[in-house]
Amino acid sequence: MDALKQLEVSPSILFVTLAVMAGIILFFRSKRHSSVKLPPGNLGFPLVGETLQFVRSLGSSTPQQFIEERMSKFGDVFKTSIIGHPTVVLCGPAGNRLVLSNENKLVQMSWPSSMMKLIGEDCLGGKTGEQHRIVRAALTRFLGPQALQNHFAKMSSGIQRHINEKWKGKDEATVLPLVKDLVFSVASRLFFGITEEHLQEQLHNLLEVILVGSFSVPLNIPGFSYHKAIQARATLADIMTHLIEKRRNELRAGTASENQDLLSVLLTFTDERGNSLADKEILDNFSMLLHGSYDSTNSPLTMLIKVLASHPESYEKVAQEQFGILSTKMEGEEIAWKDLKEMKYSWQVVQETLRMYPPIFGTFRKAITDIHYNGYTIPKGWKLLWTTYSTQTKEEYFKDADQFKPSRFEEEGKHVTPYTYLPFGGGMRVCPGWEFAKMETLLFLHHFVKAFSGLKAIDPNEKLSGKPLPPLPVNGLPIKLYSRS
């Protein structure tokens, strides 16, 4: 066991062990493509490819380093080999468009099987074709703009309560753990209707273990992160199965309504063709949404606070906008769904934060036919990877890309080149919860500036770490808070 533990510390040895058979097979398969013009690049060693360099880059404060080094050497399309798969990385808006606009024509979604075991193979990300349409339609019943209006007040009051109870009254706070607690509290209430803090805490802890395991070496051996994640996923499934059955009984008894939360919506969903969801699909999509809403919302909220701490003039403009909205209200009247449209500058600040610090790195696809692009052939069966970093942080698409400039998103980003700004993905696979995330982020910003007149990072130069993705402050972003009188 000590030797195995050493492997977890030495990923270079471990990846050689894990990828040896797949690497040999893929090496000889690649010989069959010698007659076609493949993109430039390096497949690395037959056994491990360039997996080590890729993983090392993702775990750093600059996850884009792997991509940028090869872009400068090979251009906007290059080949590599990642986790045993020959992969073509497509950069720039043209490459993004190819990958994101050709679902089921040229490409299909493709995630590592080890990750799908933790998220759930019957979730939206694991579906294609008609099955993808059915599951997406079910989720839209809850996550679409029309449905979100029904949950606006509940989300707003939950965020306000969290800030009042866990932020206000403090001179200092560490942002990341508080944001994680807030995001999970909102998700558990709106997804499951869970209000018991002990159950929220149990689910929260399980999810943390699963998230760490999702980005670890996939060894299902006691003591390893992936094994712990598999066990946590099984426990999570048991709890969620119980919640599903309990809610089904409540719906039958008339003590729960069809639209009170996501669980009820999915249990009662039937589309125009009579399709509904099996319990396994409901369970796996809950798991996916917990991952998505938790991990990809933690980053925007945390980095939003980091950015505003460095730009007090933007914080003041956000506060002025929010208090301007409140000035139109009667005494004691809370903000409403329609007020989100008036948060124009606040949303520009959020958009610029998402541009500079994308909540997702990118996603993989698999070529379902030979693809001809820019004079090269991408063979059927190869993986394709698009990334947010190939455009969102590039000077050629965003002038002064390293500077925080919310004004670039004035007029709803009409001056932004298509397929250069993709913080939630795009095409058929755009994140189904992006409107949910937008509402949550703007409500958090609203209640935060109401409570605090300003903030200051205790360490403005705090480093970021991508373990796991996306990169976040290594110490959780300690800040000083200045309460409003």
Curated annotation (Swiss-Prot):
InterPro entries: Cyt_P450, Cyt_P450_CS, Cyt_P450_E_grp-I, Cyt_P450_sf. Heme binds at C431. GO terms for biological process: paclitaxel biosynthetic process; sterol metabolic process. Keywords: Heme, Iron, Metal-binding, Monooxygenase, Oxidoreductase, Taxol biosynthesis. It is an enzyme of class 1 (oxidoreductase). The keyword Signal does not apply. Its EC number is 1.14.14.106. One of its GO terms (molecular function) is heme binding. Pfam families: p450. Its cofactor is heme. It catalyses: taxa-4(20),11-dien-5alpha-ol + reduced [NADPH--hemoprotein reductase] + O2 = taxa-4(20),11-dien-5alpha,13alpha-diol + oxidized [NADPH--hemoprotein reductase] + H2O + H(+). Pathway: Alkaloid biosynthesis; taxol biosynthesis. Involved in the transformation of a taxadienyl acetate by hydroxylation at C13 to yield taxadien-5-alpha-acetoxy-13-alpha-ol. Belongs to the cytochrome P450 family. This is Taxane 13-alpha-hydroxylase. It comes from Taxus cuspidata.
